[in-house]
Regions:
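N-terminal hydrophobic signal/anchor transmembrane helix of membrane proteins
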Residues: 43-64, 140-146, 163-164, 187-190, ...
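Bacterial Sec-exported substrate-binding components of ABC uptake systems
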Residues: 2-52, 156-186
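Proline-aspartate-enriched helix->loop->beta-strand connector
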Residues: 100, 105-111, 128
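Solvent-exposed loop/turn segments at secondary-structure junctions
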Residues: 52-55, 70-73, 108, 115-117, ...
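Alpha-helical, coiled-coil/dimerization segments enriched in small aliphatic residues
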Residues: 71, 75, 195-219
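Extracytoplasmic substrate-binding proteins
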Residues: 36, 118-190
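A short, structured surface patch at a secondary-structure boundary
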Residues: 51-100
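A local structural motif
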Residues: 38-42, 82-89, 161, 209-219
Length: 219
């Protein structure tokens, strides 16, 4: 075997080892509402089935290729739209379109454990699914989920920095609110009124700001 051939083979082996080590370095296992999810590389084609997931991705400079935007791109608020590239609509959050999702060839789908659990089997045939509790998550739940998303997309440090900024802002606002104030957040539809207690995102955020927030019955 010639010296040049030995150098070539040695180089190819080193390259192969380097790629294997790089792949292993990107491998990650995270806990979600389905148990655990393991990915062997950082996903680059992500479909987000809730607005909060789009928000989390945008905060660390990641643009999803597909969004369940209820067929109305404007449902994604302007400050978030300003941070991401145009996406393909994959239907509504309550009924995402499986064909539209599959056509995008995603390498990760981020879904809600309440709204999309029944569709988990179908979704997981398309791509790995990260199942998180966005719809009924509290303020602290959402922060933890955002960090999980940051970990999965290889932006752990950036996400922690964004979360720290938000927590600092909440503390600053809380200092301006007099002690002993009570607050309740409600949302209304044509025939219903929903009250957001401490266990909800809005209610728990108000509590983090220092307000007294009613608990749910039995809570």
């Amino acid at each position: 075997m010639t010296l040049n051939r030995r150098k070539y083979l040695t180089g190819m082996l080193a390259l192969g080892l380097g790629l294997s080590l790089a792949s292993a370095a990107h491998a990650i296992t995270v806990k979600d509402d389905q148990g655990e999810l393991t990915l062997d590389k950082v996903p680059t084609r992500i479909v987000a089935l809730e607005f909060s997931f789009v928000d989390a991705l945008a905060n660390v400079g990641i643009s999803p290729v597909g969004v369940a935007d209820d067929n109305q791109p404007s449902r994604v608020i302007q400050p978030v739209r300003d941070l991401i590239r145009p996406w393909t609509s994959v239907g509504t959050r309550s009924q995402p379109n499986m064909e539209s999702i599959a056509a995008l060839k995603p390498d990760l789908i981020i879904a809600d454990s309440s709204r999309h659990r029944a569709a988990y089997g179908q979704l997981s045939k398309i791509a790995p699914v990260l199942l998180l509790n966005s719809r009924y998550g509290s303020y602290n739940d959402i922060l933890k989920q955002d960090q999980t998303i940051g970990d999965v997309v290889g932006k752990s440090t950036e996400m922690q920095a964004r979360i720290s900024q938000l927590q600092a802002k909440v503390k600053d606002i809380a200092k301006e609110i007099p002690d002993g104030q009570t607050a309740m957040y409600g949302s209304s539809r044509e025939n219903t009124l929903d009250v957001h207690t401490q266990g909800t995102f809005a209610g728990s955020l108000l509590a983090a700001l220092g307000f007294k927030v009613p608990q749910a019955e039995g809570g």
